[in-house]
């Protein structure tokens, strides 16, 4: 599972500033996710290839009434669902009673906690943080989040070693009891994602790996009904009330000779409507299920249309690089006029998702469900397809011939060669001169050209650009013996002319 890091502290100590610093390292989705109270934000971040989910919480006001009664509920939940806590204090304001109360609560929870003193810019850090040693939380890590000072050290010297040593151990569902099976599955996944050696890849076929399919969406859109329809049994509790599913449920299954692991998730609800503690915990599990899946099936209610919550969830899926199938449920019973209106709205709001298949189904009655797995397998096969360097380079040159790269600083951008940089999602790495200066419009053109040429559907494509290093940069040009003789003759000639 992806580790979860919570930022906790009093109001205005710089939690959101640090949150933006952390999530910006990977252009993560930084937004107030639906299903969460106003003071909690979730984002994705990365340290040297190690991904984690970061939670920004609202300020905690631990006054004379006690931290247990005054601590904001969303901050309490963030502490509980986190694997590690970054407790932030204000070095300029000094130690406050609320800091002491929060530290006491954190010690009682026995969570791994690192004390971070923010706003140390312009101060003698050692003197400014001396009072915070009384909190009894160990070493203090001074930073200036607004300027980025100390943030890299915090990541590399604190969080990264912790992530390397402590793998979050979470409760497994009944279907995950066979540890050997899951260990073997993880080893195979490493090969799918391009982490295997060349010898291992030669005898590995992605078709041997079960496809992990996550079914996600807002509450009461019919996710569990769809799961039961696919399985042909009442495997998941279904009741006409939002929030029936409380956790992500992993269900192995087989269809048409191919193995799948179905992940039925809890719904991501509109903020302000999440009241029960257990339901709030399920949101983070949904996000982790998306990270863990190969293909994500986003279920939308045809009666309600696509909402802002659907778009926010869609944004997280795209940032995760997961393959996508869009399912519009409860299609039965709608008049043709209403169906046309729904399709028109989908075209308008999902115009930027041109690679995902859209299915209109009725999970309750089963209409259209049988066609879903064609799109699921298509998306997975496209995301794990191996393409050699020669083919990618040929496609790149064809794209450049059809539409030349633009001029950058009066020089034509030169595309040299392309190769695969990873799978699931497919990554194409293009090498050349000034390629990083290409405008976004031409980058989109290349991405769409690769998609059409490789006939890729159901999965996003990522293109990375690399420029070759100049081998002579910073080096003095050494003259050949012949050039040295010519230089001596020229210097002698110039001296004679001066006389």
UniProtKB/Swiss-Prot annotation:
Please tell me where GTP 2 binds in this chain: 217-224, 264-268, 329-332
Q: Which CDD domains match?
A: EngA1, EngA2
Q: Which SUPFAM superfamilies match?
A: P-loop containing nucleoside triphosphate hydrolases
Sequence positions that bind GTP 1 = 9-16, 56-60, 118-121
The UniProt entry, under PROSITE patterns, shows:
G_ENGA
The EngA-type G domain is annotated at: 3-166, 211-384
Per UniProt, which keywords does this protein have? Answer: GTP-binding, Nucleotide-binding, Repeat, Ribosome biogenesis
Record-annotated KH-like domain positions: 385-469
Repeat listed as a keyword: yes
Does the keyword GTP-binding feature in the UniProt annotation? Answer: yes
Give a single Pfam family match.
Answer: MMR_HSR1
Q: Report the GO molecular function annotations.
A: GTP binding; ribosome binding
Any one of the GO BP annotations: ribosome biogenesis
Per its UniProt entry, which superkingdom is the organism in?
Answer: Bacteria
Question: Which InterPro entries does this UniProt record tie to the protein?
Answer: G_ENGA, GTP-bd, GTPase_Der, KH_dom-like, KH_dom-like_a/b, P-loop_NTPase, Small_GTP-bd
How does this polypeptide assemble, per the annotation?
A: Associates with the 50S ribosomal subunit.
The record describes the protein's role as:
GTPase that plays an essential role in the late steps of ribosome biogenesis.
Q: Name the family.
A: Belongs to the TRAFAC class TrmE-Era-EngA-EngB-Septin-like GTPase superfamily. EngA (Der) GTPase family.
Q: What is this protein called?
A: GTPase Der
Species assigned in the record: Erwinia tasmaniensis (strain DSM 17950 / CFBP 7177 / CIP 109463 / NCPPB 4357 / Et1/99)
Q: What is the lineage of its organism?
A: Bacteria, Pseudomonadati, Pseudomonadota, Gammaproteobacteria, Enterobacterales
